[in-house]
Amino acid sequence: MYVESKAYFKMPKSFILGQIREPGCLNRFHPFCKRNIAHKWPGNGSIDELEYLNGRKYKRYFFNWTDNGYDLKIGGKKEMAIVNWYVEGSDEECSLRVRINPNIENYVPFKNILIQNIFWFLYIRPKLQSYINHVVNGFSFYVSNNTDINKNQFGKHSWFSSY
């Protein structure tokens, strides 16, 4: 089970990689980010903290830092997901794909696989898809306009925005 969002750019792969590898980069393009602080940077073993607009905080633990992006684990007391940031392309154009692989047991309070699947398809998947679309749209806006996005720029999210 996963959700993903992809964006295409008429920009060099190296530029896009540089943007997603900047410490604290979510401050510039994540529409639900209150603050993003790097504690250890860069490369494998990097750690940062993402605080959402609603005050919820998660640590992000980076691994598999490669020439095409990185993977990270995000969570608090529980690991909520593994997230893949992957860039492919050339010196003229490229794409960014962000995939969220949730640890479904930490989203659903039921152990029954059937109930987990129902929750996944009817509630969790649409919420995560909306979330990752907003994040990738924020990144696309940021790199295309060379300006930071506003909080909730593409609409609020019930899990991460403050109401």
Where do the model's predicted regions map?
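Beta-strand/loop substructures that line and gate deep hydrophobic ligand-binding cavities in soluble
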Residues: 76-134, 150-152
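Hydrophobic ligand-binding cavity/cleft-lining segments
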Residues: 1-42, 160-163
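Short amphipathic alpha-helical segments, especially helix-boundary/capping motifs
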Residues: 22-24, 34-36, 58-62, 111-116
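Generic structural detector for well-ordered beta-strands
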Residues: 6-10, 61, 86
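Glycine-rich portal/gate segments that line the openings of hydrophobic small-molecule binding cavities
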Residues: 27, 37-82, 93-95, 130-145, ...
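Short hydrophobic/aromatic-rich motifs at helix boundaries and adjacent loops
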Residues: 6-7, 31-32, 55-58, 107-112
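Beta-strand elements of well-folded, non-transmembrane domains
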Residues: 11, 54-56, 66, 89, ...
